[in-house]
Amino acid sequence: MHMTSPSAKPLVVSIMGPTASGKTATALAIAEQIPSEIISVDSALVYREMNIGTAKPTDEERASVPHHLIDILDPLDAYSVMQFRQDALRLVAEISARGKLALLVGGTMLYFKGLKDGLDALPQADAALRAELDAEAALIGSPAMHAKLAKLDPITAARLKPNDTQRIQRALEIITLTGQPMSALLAQAPKSELPFTLLPIALEPSERSVLHARIATRFDAMLKDGGLLDEVRALRARGDLHPGLPSMRCVGYRQSWEYLDGAYGLAELREKGIAATRQLAKRQLTWLRGMPERQTIDCLAPDVAGSILRKIVSADKVPK
């Protein structure tokens, strides 16, 4: 293996996949073989005080390999695709300058797309317009706003859930500001050339039922001894958080909040939490299928990390 020459673009590996596909364990195994640092590509892991429901890497795992973009925000705050792109580009440059391999690891596919394709075609947020849209949503509800979006931008509406208020509002905001649907703007946006060579790896299950079983096992582990519920109780006790925030809309947290509100019992919480996680995995796999450049590896196969390592080595650009 050769060191990347100063003029050549460094190699960066993205490890994408649905929830419970083993992305973290795979990245850690790769980092044992090649000097690496991990950049989290996860819209839930950015939040502090949210550890159990996000399946955040443990302190031991984070001590063994440097991790970035984890615990960088208070749950009261929001984090945009634009912010992620800026942070990721900066971190890749810093990690490469240290002679290490940057591993982009996660399941927030919109972040991967934003990093790869850029977002220059989309206008900045307009606070006054957003306030108007928020007021309208409070009046008629998020599903009605989703129906409105479906008439104006059916492509974007099709990939958003009716209760995904934040992204629905953003899509409507873009239409109002530009007169064009977000899907059209993204399609015509000039592709911005990345300052690195990207090796996109997708961990996808050969048997969807096995992934579903993993999801159920993991959610049960989160509920064990009241762990997730205690975490959400502590977040509620702060007094400044509410279910409409991006952080509290994360899978598992929304359902736990509703359970603590008395909306349903523990058995239904488990059922709803597992169903929501399975839906998330389905959406993640749909996103991945729209990335023809990805190199797919069965996340259920033995030695997933070894398969990826062979692909990295064949790229012949890795730090020693």
Swiss-Prot record:
Substrate binds at residues 19-24. CDD domains: NK (cd02019). The keyword Nucleotide-binding applies. Pfam families: IPPT. ATP binds at residues 17-24. Signal peptide: none annotated. It is an enzyme of class 2 (transferase). It catalyses: adenosine(37) in tRNA + dimethylallyl diphosphate = N(6)-dimethylallyladenosine(37) in tRNA + diphosphate. It comes from the Bacteria. Keywords: ATP-binding, Magnesium, Nucleotide-binding, Transferase, tRNA processing. Its EC number is 2.5.1.75. Residues 42-45, 166-170, 249-254 are annotated as: Interaction with substrate tRNA. Catalyzes the transfer of a dimethylallyl group onto the adenine at position 37 in tRNAs that read codons beginning with uridine, leading to the formation of N6-(dimethylallyl)adenosine (i(6)A). HAMAP family: IPP_trans (MF_00185). This is tRNA dimethylallyltransferase. It comes from Herminiimonas arsenicoxydans. The lineage of its organism: Bacteria, Pseudomonadati, Pseudomonadota, Betaproteobacteria, Burkholderiales. The gene is miaA.
